[in-house]
């Protein structure tokens, strides 16, 4: 596949990012995506130690962040990686913000810029205080001009960007409700703005490829507008709300999807609903495209063995040819390697050679990782995965699920028992990985215990156990930093799964 990439997410030190970039081409990836105009927020999360008060925060100045951005690009260029940039943040720039993350603004939109913002809930202001999540009034000509001028200026100043992602605001049910905007759809407006952007880039003599996004409201295909110059653009299908308890099918027929109602959208959870939206878009755009998916962005924390999510990734990638796309980019934490890095390994290998059986990848990876006795490690991780539920972790379905509580109790017992059977390996690399698996058993016992009470409807005890889990991983983070993103697991657990933020 032409597109084999990873997008920066989570909380990251500069060393984390540089190590990951070094690893990418060695494993068959060819692209890396730096979100926002500058990827400030991902560095800020780590150096401020957000969600881990046991570590002392480090202040970053603008010059520090700029130096990190340059260092990352130099590392990419050295290895010949395709450079993707920006995505969200353009709308924030029009409204007077830097557009370098999902930061909460301490003020309202400046009065002179307020008419450019979407009218939502009877007012034109930052959506829930976050500029990057704030749409514009796309029927406003000045808003369209400023938005596209900003992209052209960035493309001119950043010739290193092979692909520039032009997305609207993040979040959903936050589009403009003014009379003019309601005469059309946000997807039609998006396509017209893409055409305007192409005209401006052409006049400026800029060859930059533009990636456009099928995501949330924009999953719905336009009703009238069409892209006039397909060669400029690359379609990116981003089914962020999909289930990860199943994979994309090799044989697919569209299904009925709910009609779009402005600012009353229910995000589609089934694979079939999401793919039906993709098929509708492909009727109006037949150019280059790739899947932008999230197995290692949130759902993976719900798979305590990482074996089920690895299999989903493998099968998803083998289904890409069914949908006529040219690759895959993973929106993920870079430190998604707890208990193992097997899912990322599977992703890379499947994208470069689809002939390799999953079982061959498994045996090669784990025999190298654990040495003698690796089969026991695999059997344990597979049992954890079989009992885990990524949908529950991602807040799909009710929180009260007694049958699931039984599975979490079983997980706790499995982890407790397996700790007694961890061998003392001969080689240091094997010993380190077995020791990490011992850590993961303790991690699993604490988290599964909290999930067991949550799925029984006992919120108070669930939160108490979750706080114990957080205390444990916060204390352990200095030793586990390269493999476990403490910031992100706590953020997802409290934003989606249903736990309360611990002290």
Short names for language-model regions:
Residues 394-503:
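Histidine-centered catalytic/metal-binding microenvironments
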Residues 3-270, 274-278, 282-285, 289-317, ...:
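Aromatic-lined carbohydrate-binding surfaces of glycoside hydrolases
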């Amino acid at each position: 596949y032409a597109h084999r990439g990873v997008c920066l997410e989570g909380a990251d030190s500069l060393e984390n990012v540089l190590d990951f970039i070094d690893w990418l081409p060695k494993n068959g990836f060819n692209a890396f995506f730096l979100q926002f105009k500058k990827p400030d927020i991902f560095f800020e999360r780590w150096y401020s130690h957000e969600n881990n008060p046991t570590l002392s925060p480090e202040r970053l100045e603008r010059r520090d962040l700029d130096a990190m951005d340059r260092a990352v690009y130099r590392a990419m260029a050295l290895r010949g990686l395709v450079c993707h940039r920006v995505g969200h943040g353009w709308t924030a720039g029009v409204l007077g913000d830097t557009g370098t993350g999902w930061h909460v603004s301490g003020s309202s939109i400046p009065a002179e810029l307020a008419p450019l913002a979407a009218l939502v809930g009877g007012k034109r202001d930052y959506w829930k205080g976050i500029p990057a999540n704030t749409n514009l009034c796309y029927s406003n000509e000045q808003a369209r001009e400023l938005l596209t001028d900003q992209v052209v200026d960035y493309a001119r100043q950043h010739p290193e960007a092979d692909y520039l992602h032009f997305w609207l605001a993040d979040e959903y049910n936050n589009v403009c409700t003014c009379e003019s905007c309601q005469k059309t759809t946000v997807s039609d407006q998006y396509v017209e703005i893409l055409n305007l952007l192409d005209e401006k880039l052409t006049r400026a003599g800029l060859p930059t490829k533009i990636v456009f996004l099928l995501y949330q409201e924009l999953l719905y295909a336009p009703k009238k507008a069409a892209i006039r110059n397909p060669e400029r653009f690359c379609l990116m299908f981003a089914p962020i709300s999909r289930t990860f308890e199943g994979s994309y099918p090799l044989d697919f027929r569209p299904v009925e999807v709910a009609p779009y109602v402005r600012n009353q959208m229910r995000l589609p959870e089934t694979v079939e609903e999401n793919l039906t939206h993709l098929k509708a878009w492909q009727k109006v755009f037949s150019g280059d495209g790739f899947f932008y998916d999230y197995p290692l962005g949130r759902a993976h924390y719900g798979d305590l063995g990482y074996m089920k999510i690895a299999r989903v990734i493998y099968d998803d990638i083998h289904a890409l040819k069914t949908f006529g796309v040219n690759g895959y980019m993973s929106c993920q934490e870079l430190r998604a390697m707890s208990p193992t890095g097997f899912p990322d390994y599977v992703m890379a290998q499947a994208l470069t050679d689809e002939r390799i059986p999953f079982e061959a990848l498994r045996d090669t990876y784990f025999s190298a990782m654990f040495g003698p006795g690796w089969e026991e490690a695999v059997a344990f991780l597979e049992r954890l995965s079989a009992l885990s539920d990524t949908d529950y972790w991602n807040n799909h379905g009710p929180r009260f699920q007694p049958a699931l509580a039984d599975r979490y109790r079983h997980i706790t017992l499995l982890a407790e028992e397996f700790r007694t059977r961890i061998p003392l390996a001969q080689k240091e690399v094997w010993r380190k990985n077995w020791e990490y698996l011992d850590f993961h058993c303790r991690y699993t016992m604490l988290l599964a215990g909290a999930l067991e009470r949550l799925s029984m409807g006992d919120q108070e005890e669930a939160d108490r156990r979750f706080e114990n889990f957080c205390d444990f991983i916060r204390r352990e983070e200095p030793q586990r930093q390269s493999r476990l993103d403490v910031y992100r697991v706590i953020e997802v657990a409290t934003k989606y799964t249903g736990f309360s933020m611990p002290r």
